[in-house]
UniProtKB/Swiss-Prot annotation:
<keyword id="KW-0444">Lipid biosynthesis</keyword>
<comment type="function">
    <text>Catalyzes the stereospecific epoxidation of squalene at the terminal double bond to form (S)-2,3-epoxysqualene, the first oxygenation step in sterol biosynthesis.</text>
</comment>
<comment type="pathway">
    <text>Terpene metabolism; lanosterol biosynthesis; lanosterol from farnesyl diphosphate.</text>
</comment>
<comment type="similarity">
    <text>Belongs to the sterol desaturase family.</text>
</comment>
<feature type="short sequence motif" description="Histidine box-2">
    <location>
        <begin position="226"/>
        <end position="230"/>
    </location>
</feature>
<comment type="subunit">
    <text>Interacts with cytochrome b5/PHATRDRAFT_30770.</text>
</comment>
<feature type="transmembrane region" description="Helical">
    <location>
        <begin position="243"/>
        <end position="263"/>
    </location>
</feature>
<feature type="domain" description="Fatty acid hydroxylase">
    <location>
        <begin position="197"/>
        <end position="332"/>
    </location>
</feature>
<keyword id="KW-0472">Membrane</keyword>
<dbReference type="GO" id="GO:0005789">
    <property type="term" value="C:endoplasmic reticulum membrane"/>
</dbReference>
<keyword id="KW-0812">Transmembrane</keyword>
<feature type="short sequence motif" description="Histidine box-1">
    <location>
        <begin position="211"/>
        <end position="215"/>
    </location>
</feature>
<feature type="transmembrane region" description="Helical">
    <location>
        <begin position="277"/>
        <end position="297"/>
    </location>
</feature>
<feature type="compositionally biased region" description="Low complexity">
    <location>
        <begin position="12"/>
        <end position="26"/>
    </location>
</feature>
<feature type="transmembrane region" description="Helical">
    <location>
        <begin position="153"/>
        <end position="173"/>
    </location>
</feature>
<feature type="region of interest" description="Disordered">
    <location>
        <begin position="1"/>
        <end position="26"/>
    </location>
</feature>
<keyword id="KW-0408">Iron</keyword>
Length: 348
């Protein structure tokens, strides 16, 4: 009997030891190993852990609808903060045929829409950059992402006079001087998604053309306008609007004005949605990291950070920003995978 007990104890110890070794080889936590060995509970498989991690990472995709927070909440009749309930009628009813100056409410809300969208982008990027969304981010370039203090990057992004300061000035002048089509001053309805899509495509198409011209018109003009932005050959998210006043005027202001006068039937909510989604997307494609949705975006021809890194690294490819369609048509598109692993990481 004693011999049988000793043999049984030895077998149990061997089983526990082998289980412990197997657990340590599977990269499980100490708590999970204890639960398995002592209490007989099965740990989560690598697949389950991977699925959970991916799901958390993909939760960052909520940043896309959150860009439209202000126009969605204020324009919906079902919203508790619908503009009709929040603002007096005299603040938004405006006779476009009169000689009176436009009401500034639409302008203020438009700037607010962009600001709120940007805040959601910053929050998402902070959580993503520091690994709070399931996994540590992968840098696009093989040499790794630039190191910087997040607060410094954010303050640099906000404080660029050629960025938000110039854009706010443009919005104020065109709105208050009635340089926009009449429908843009209307608060009726909600976001018009067809017109929103048309604005984004036209804006990027015109911006693509201006971008190419900035590169080829003359070396002197390039040095004055676009070269300051191209000093970032390994850009970070906060470099999006870091350039020159001339660059912003040529590549953003002119396309914005032309787009507004081509897509002439937007209401104020669509204009807000366009401004916010455009500014946020332009910011995101300067990211130094790969986002979970980049693979899907690339299959659809939508702009990703890796696509834009190709332009910053080589200068003569991928002039588009939001869409790669114009580069594909013009023969200037290059897939980031073509430069891996020497310049870019695999599968970016």
């Amino acid at each position: 009997m004693l011999v049988d007990r000793v043999e049984n104890n030895e077998k149990q110890q061997q089983q526990m030891a082998s289980s412990s070794d197997a657990m340590s080889d599977s990269s499980l936590s100490d708590d999970e190993i204890i639960e398995h060995v002592v209490h007989g509970k099965e740990p989560k498989s690598t697949y389950e852990l991977s699925w959970v991690s991916n799901a958390i990472a993909w939760s960052g995709a909520l940043v896309w609808p959150l860009m439209l927070t202000v126009p969605l909440l204020l324009s919906s009749m079902y919203s508790p903060i619908s503009y009709r309930q929040v603002f007096p009628e005299s603040w938004y009813v405006y006779d476009t045929l009169s000689n009176c100056a436009p009401k500034p409410l639409g302008l203020v809300l438009g700037i607010l829409a962009v600001a709120v969208g940007q805040v959601f982008v910053w929050i998402f990027f902070y959580l993503f950059k520091f690994g709070y969304l399931g996994t540590d981010p992968r840098s696009i370039q093989s040499k790794g992402a630039r190191e910087y203090i997040f607060r410094e990057g954010l303050l640099t992004h906000i404080g660029q006079p050629e960025g938000f300061v110039l854009l706010i000035g443009y919005l104020a002048i065109t709105w208050m001087l009635k340089l926009m089509p009449q429908s843009y001053y209307s608060f009726e309805g909600t976001i018009q998604y067809k017109e929103l899509f048309m604005c984004l495509v036209l804006q990027d198409g015109i911006q693509y053309t201006m971008h190419v011209l900035e590169h080829i018109v003359s070396p002197a003009f390039y040095q004055m306008s676009h070269k300051p932005h191209h000093r970032f050959t390994n850009p970070r998210l906060f470099d999006a609007f870091n350039g020159s006043l001339m660059d912003t005027f040529c590549m953003i202001i002119i396309p914005l004005f032309v787009t507004a006068n081509l897509v002439r039937h937007c209401n104020v909510w669509t204009y807000m949605a366009f401004g916010s989604s455009y500014a946020c997307w332009l910011t995101l494609i300067h990211s130094e990291y790969v986002f979970p949705w980049d693979g899907i975006f690339r299959k659809l021809g939508l702009g990703t950070p890796a696509d834009h890194h190709v332009h910053h690294k080589f200068f003569k490819f991928n002039y588009g920003h939001l869409f790669m369609w114009f580069d594909q048509l013009g023969g200037t598109y290059r897939d980031p995978s073509g430069f891996a692993p020497r310049v870019f990481r695999e599968n970016v």
